[in-house]
């Protein structure tokens, strides 16, 4: 029988070329499988006894060694023969050899999730959304109180030396970065344009002054938006948000919640949340189009002017 690192396989119409375990530092050595730390139960205990001992979902979560996604792999980006694998705990850089066999070059431990990655030239862009993220990539978390040490947004790394990636820029955002999409660049002005999709909670404006939550009638809210980020290739430290358009707004009424406002569609239908965020945006540059997966909606944007995306209804 297969175990954690030598699992048995079932495969159809595919060929497994190679399989690599997570590098050191990219998993919890006390819980390498990432499972919940469940206490052993007496197999002879009757059902009634089990019910008495059972904990709530919240209490069970507190008993885990580490949250289930703390070390999960998420996204892969490529540049020539280089492969970068993002994760909730940082990223790993591999060199691809003949036959597609990857060899680890370096690992960067930088927690915060989700770890969505893109590569443009010698710059690696990474999404960070969790409240444990820190500006300095530390593993100790950032606490529960507002602090300038917390980081949620877009990180930029210089990977010109694959063995020694260096963080050269950050962009703090109100809802972090679940995913991001490189829209264009670098153009003649030497700038990369990125669309950021934040789906996490809105941070306290004591921590970031421009952030406001769901306050009725307050159009400053960080909800119902994407962020347009500009990255100067020659000086990524000057990267910034240039605008945060309300892409779900009703053009006639100006209401920010211009699409689905939440609820159900009638008897025996599921209840869904209001459309106020995008999970991911895919870009089709030659057609000047972007497609967003946004709270259950598939949305097309005209990005002829990438600084001013227009929703196509």
What are these regions (language model features)?
Residues 1-313:
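Feature marking well-ordered beta-strand scaffolds used for ligand recognition
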């Amino acid at each position: 029988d297969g175990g954690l690192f030598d699992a048995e396989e079932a495969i159809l119409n595919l060929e497994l070329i190679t399989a690599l375990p997570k590098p050191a530092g990219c998993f919890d050595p006390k819980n390498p499988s990432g499972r919940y730390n469940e206490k052993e139960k007496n197999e002879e205990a009757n059902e009634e006894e089990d019910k008495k001992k059972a904990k709530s979902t919240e209490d069970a979560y507190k008993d885990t060694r580490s949250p289930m996604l703390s070390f999960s792999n998420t996204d892969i980006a490529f540049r020539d023969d280089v492969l970068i694998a993002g994760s909730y705990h940082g990223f790993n850089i591999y060199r691809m050899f003949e036959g597609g066999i990857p060899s680890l070059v370096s690992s960067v431990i930088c927690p915060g999730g989700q770890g969505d990655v893109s590569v443009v030239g010698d710059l690696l862009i990474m999404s960070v959304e969790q409240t444990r993220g820190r500006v300095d990539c530390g593993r100790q978390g950032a606490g529960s109180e507002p602090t300038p040490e917390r980081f949620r947004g877009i990180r930029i790394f210089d990977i010109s030396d694959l063995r020694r990636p260096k963080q050269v820029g950050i962009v703090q955002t109100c809802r972090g970065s679940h995913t991001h999409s490189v829209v264009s660049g670098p153009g003649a002005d030497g700038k990369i344009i990125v669309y950021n999709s934040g789906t996490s909670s809105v941070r306290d404006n004591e921590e970031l002054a421009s952030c406001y939550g769901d306050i009725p009638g307050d159009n400053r809210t960080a909800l119902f938006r994407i962020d347009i980020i500009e990255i100067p290739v020659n000086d990524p430290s000057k990267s910034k948000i240039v605008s945060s358009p309300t892409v779900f707004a009703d053009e006639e009424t100006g209401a920010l919640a211009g699409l689905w406002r939440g609820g159900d569609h009638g008897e025996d239908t599921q209840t869904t949340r209001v459309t106020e965020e995008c999970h991911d945006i895919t870009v089709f540059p030659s057609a000047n189009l972007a497609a967003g997966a946004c709270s259950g909606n598939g949305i097309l944007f005209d990005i002829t002017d990438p600084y001013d995306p227009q929703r196509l209804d």
